Amino acid sequence: MTAPRATVVVCCFNGAGELPKVLEALATQTLHDQLEVLVVDDGSSDGTADVARAHGVRVIVHERNAGLAAARNTGWRSANAPVVVFTDDDCRPAPDWLERLLPAIESDPGVIGAGGAVLGVDADSLTRRYLQANNPLLPLESDLLESDGLAHRLWLYVRRSVAPQQPTGARDVSSVVGANMAFRVETLKLAEGFDERFHFGGEEEDLCRRLVLSGAGRLRFVPEALVIHEFEPSLRDTLRRSKAYGRGNARMYLKHSDLSPTVYPLPLLVVAALAAAAFLRRPRWAVAALLMPQLLFAHWPAKAVVRRRPEWLVYPYLQLLQEGCSDVGFAGMMLTGRDQFAAGEEA
């Protein structure tokens, strides 16, 4: 039997409702007959494994929930192909997804991993429209690795907040997005895979950082390799994810001692200004604090006027809430996770 060209791993935890859609999308891939599809059921209690088996794909079941990083490790270690590709159960790959993604790895021995674009589903709620306009699932650009210093990261934050212009076209990046990424299996073996202490949030960034800084090779972004992500339409879920990403940022900082912390300054400034206004009884300070998001994220009100979309005037505050929840997650992990990432300890 001919070995598959790639193994597609879908990790699930109680994903029975969403899983059929992604499996159907994988069944319509232009390269379908060259693929192995593997579902890793990470301790679900809703019949996820039975749903996967009904679609005729390989299934591996964790008896207990071990986290996304552990599920991904199970997936690539069980792959029968030289390349392993990851997507999620709430994603819908385009029919030519892998036809466009795989050549980035296969045609260049210096490329050890590749990722494609992850876009939000058609906007039918305020939250989804915001996430479509302010996509949280973008690759980390290569300029992030130019320096680990705090000043460099602060400059990147201000620059991207004021004028968030994203590069276009295929290019090298410092990290790809977990919902749309592919690696050589041999490369993952050398790196010992994902660090399972990350559980969820930051695990792919940690892996990519280790790979790139080790000199193993380059990571390539292929924007035409498209996956649609069905974001949960509620603001509550968006903020929950932001908090989880903040915990991942803290794990990155605890593990990589040379890395500056990823903390968003604007929520801290707004809270400090509001506290000072209340303490000193300066109501004008409170007004100024509430206008800070409109000034720093000035592209939102500008676009609201130019494009006649008044709803976008709310977006600076949604972004403020996201960044604030990320900071809360960061602080919580810094308080509780130090023992887990003791100095010199490896995964």
Segments (PLM) and residue ranges:
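Short, well-formed alpha-helical segments that are part of the catalytic scaffolds
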Residues: 14-28
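Conserved donor NDP-sugar-binding/catalytic core segment of glycosyltransferases
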Residues: 96-143
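Conserved donor nucleotide-binding strand/loop of the catalytic core
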Residues: 49-78
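Short, flexible, basic/aromatic active-site loop/helix in glycosyltransferases
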Residues: 134-173
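A short, conserved alpha-helix in the catalytic core of glycosyltransferases
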Residues: 174-183, 187-192, 197-225
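Active-site-adjacent helix/loop segment of glycosyltransferases
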Residues: 219-334
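Short aromatic/hydrophobic "clamp" motif used to bind/position activated sugar donors
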Residues: 84
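A conserved acidic beta->alpha catalytic loop
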Residues: 25, 32, 41-49, 64, ...
